[in-house]
């Protein structure tokens, strides 16, 4: 068994861990060990580097932990997919590359919780900007020299994108030029984490590329964290496995857990930090009975509303093997073409009811009819809207099954457990149909393939959701930040009741944000990195942002085609 000593040990080289490793080692007097259970992000592996290949990593286990939930009681007892990234970059290595920060009111809402006053949107915006290089340059909302490459939609994109955005506007919803700017609400182009050369902009590429040659950073791949070591109530190091070899590393200052919303509570529980009754079931010595570890688990659920496309403009031909070598060659040589896009180039956020204070439904538009993981492709030209609710009141949990670090935990999201979930999904399907029947899509829209035009009553819609809704791969909130009885960490990520231990990843969100989670997770890590280094927070932003204040969710009077009557 080998033992080394560092100032900081980071467990997990994902969206947050790579940020911390890079920022902490900017100080040459600080040493950092970065442990990652997966392997390197091989730059010649098209599965993780080509944006259009985003479905491939989810189909195997090289880059994907491939977790599965327990039977979900409100979803026909299905065991549902819960993919999480494995390798340098973590889930930023296998995600859909949609760069969505969340709504300003998400963070303002966090800040109303006791002790989280420094997490307002205006406190967070400087850290979003710090992390970002946007291809069209900086402004009050966007950065121009950060590690994460963000690309915007360009002229010449698939015509279905603009048609779907215009259809949303024709249905009476707002148009927004920037889903991460002044106004998230509405339909518009979607920013993506893709480099100017058409490669995936993971945090391994953006952050670790600038830090990995530093002598004060040691990166160890294929290193599975087994337990956090404690000296009394102080975290003193990490025991980890590298194949059959056991090793320990000591931390002079802190252990930073950045393993994600599934593995972070799993590691804490395995280390004796979690609900005491759960730990006793597995005869784990209790370091601290902390009841919130693994509780409050949240996710976004979504469904695919699919249509036949009457004109041959969809991406259907690109799914055929005989067309893929040409697509791959153009991407490899030039970084252009169909391979250089994730093809989520437009989307939107809406409120389904006037009394919703900020958007509760998200859309991703895709110019092909296929499941996110590449399965169940419709054998014709088609297009679809990914539609899902943003802040479900349902709560789940992550619970250790065994003390073996190779065993997956028990995961239950408890999807669709509340009446509001069902109301919002029914509203979302009906709103989507109103959007899709607008004139902008007349030349493209064929028959509705899923759920199908005959699926109309509440009962029929509920049956469809129960059988067909899938995860959007946004697990979060399982080690929540705050100061109530179920909080796990304080406003700087420090675990309550312990010293020298922080959790820094999407698990510390108190409530899930409105949209995709990679950008907020990077922001959280940037913000907490300053606190770890003893730096003053960046100055609060001074910008305006949209608040509905009771404005109608939809201007029905301006809709080109009025809602259908029942």
UniProtKB/Swiss-Prot annotation:
Quick one: which residues bind FAD? 7-36
What pathway does the annotation place this protein in?
Amine and polyamine biosynthesis; betaine biosynthesis via choline pathway; betaine aldehyde from choline (cytochrome c reductase route): step 1/1
Biological processes, Gene Ontology terms: glycine betaine biosynthetic process from choline
Q: Which GO terms describe its cellular component?
A: membrane
Its cofactor is:
FAD
Write one Gene Ontology MF term: betaine-aldehyde dehydrogenase (NAD+) activity
Catalytic activity, reaction form: choline + A = betaine aldehyde + AH2; betaine aldehyde + NAD(+) + H2O = glycine betaine + NADH + 2 H(+)
Tell me one Pfam family matched here.
Answer: GMC_oxred_C
List, alphabetically, the InterPro entries matched. Answer: BetA, FAD/NAD-bd_sf, GMC_OxRdtase, GMC_OxRdtase_N, GMC_OxRtase_C
Cite the active-site annotation. 474
Keywords, A to Z?
FAD, Flavoprotein, NAD, Oxidoreductase
Report which superkingdom the organism of origin falls in: Bacteria
What EC number(s) are associated with this protein in UniProt? 1.1.99.1, 1.2.1.8
Signal peptide (UniProt feature, chain positions): none
**Residue span of region Disordered:** 185-204
What exactly does this protein do?
Answer: Involved in the biosynthesis of the osmoprotectant glycine betaine. Catalyzes the oxidation of choline to betaine aldehyde and betaine aldehyde to glycine betaine at the same rate.
Q: Identify the PANTHER family for this entry.
A: CHOLINE DEHYDROGENASE, MITOCHONDRIAL, GLUCOSE-METHANOL-CHOLINE GMC OXIDOREDUCTASE
Q: Which family does it belong to?
A: Belongs to the GMC oxidoreductase family.
What is the recorded name of this protein? Oxygen-dependent choline dehydrogenase
What gene is this protein translated from? betA
């Amino acid at each position: 068994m080998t033992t080394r000593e560092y100032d900081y040990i980071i467990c997990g080289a994902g969206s947050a861990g790579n940020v911390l490793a890079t920022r902490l080692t900017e100080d040459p007097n600080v040493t950092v060990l970065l442990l990652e259970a997966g392997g390197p992000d091989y730059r010649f592996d098209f599965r993780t580097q080509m944006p259009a290949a985003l479905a491939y990593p989810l189909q195997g286990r090289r880059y994907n932990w491939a977790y599965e939930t327990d039977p979900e009681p409100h979803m026909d007892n299905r065991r549902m997919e819960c993919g999480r990234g494995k390798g340098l970059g973590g889930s930023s290595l296998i995600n859909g590359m949609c760069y969505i920060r969340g709504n300003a009111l998400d963070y303002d809402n966090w800040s109303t919780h006791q002790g989280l006053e420094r997490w307002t949107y205006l406190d967070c915006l400087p850290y979003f900007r710090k992390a970002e290089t946007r291809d069209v340059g900086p402004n009050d909302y966007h950065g121009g020299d950060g590690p994460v490459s963000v690309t915007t939609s360009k002229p010449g994109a698939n015509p279905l994108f603009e048609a779907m955005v215009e259809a949303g506007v024709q249905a009476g919803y707002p148009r927004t030029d920037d889903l991460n700017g002044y106004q998230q609400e509405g339909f518009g182009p979607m920013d993506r984490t893709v480099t100017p050369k058409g490669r995936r902009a993971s945090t391994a590429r953006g952050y670790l590329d600038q830090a990995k040659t530093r002598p004060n950073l040691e990166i160890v791949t294929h290193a599975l964290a087994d337990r956090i070591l404690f000296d009394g109530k102080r975290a003193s190091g990490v025991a980890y496995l590298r194949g059959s070899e056991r090793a320990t590393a000591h931390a002079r200052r802190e252990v930073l857990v950045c393993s994600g919303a599934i593995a972070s509570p799993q590691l804490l529980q395995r280390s004796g930090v979690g609900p005491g009754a759960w730990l006793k079931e597995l005869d784990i010595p209790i370091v601290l009975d902390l009841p919130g570890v693994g509780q409050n688990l949240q996710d976004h659920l979504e469904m695919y509303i699919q249509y036949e496309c009457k004109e041959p403009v969809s991406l259907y031909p690109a799914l055929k093997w005989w067309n893929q070598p040409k697509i791959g060659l153009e991407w490899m040589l030039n970084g252009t073409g169909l391979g250089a896009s994730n093809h989520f180039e437009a989307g939107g956020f809406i409120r389904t009811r006037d009394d919703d204070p900020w958007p509760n439904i998200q859309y991703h538009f895709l110019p092909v009819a296929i499941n996110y993981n590449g399965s169940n492709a419709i054998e014709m030209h088609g297009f679809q809207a990914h539609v899902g609710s943003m802040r479900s009141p349902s709560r789940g949990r992550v619970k250790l099954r065994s003390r073996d670090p190779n065993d997956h935990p028990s995961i239950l999201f408890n999807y669709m457990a509340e009446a509001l979930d069902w109301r919002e999904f029914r509203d979302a399907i009906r709103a989507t149909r109103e959007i899709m029947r607008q004139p902008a899509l007349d030349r493209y829209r064929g028959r509705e393939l899923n759920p199908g035009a005959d699926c109309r009553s509440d009962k029929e819609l509920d049956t469809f959701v129960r059988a067909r809704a899938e995860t959007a791969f946004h697990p979060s909130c399982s080690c929540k930040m705050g100061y109530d009885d179920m909080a796990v960490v304080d406003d700087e990520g420090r675990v309550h009741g312990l010293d020298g231990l922080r959790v820094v990843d999407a698990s510390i969100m108190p409530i899930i944000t409105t949209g995709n989670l990679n950008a907020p997770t990077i922001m959280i890590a940037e913000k907490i990195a300053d606190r770890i280094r003893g730096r003053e927070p960046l100055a609060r932003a001074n910008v305006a942002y949209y608040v509905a204040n009771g404005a109608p969710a939809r201007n029905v009077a301006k809709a080109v085609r009025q809602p259908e009557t029942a």
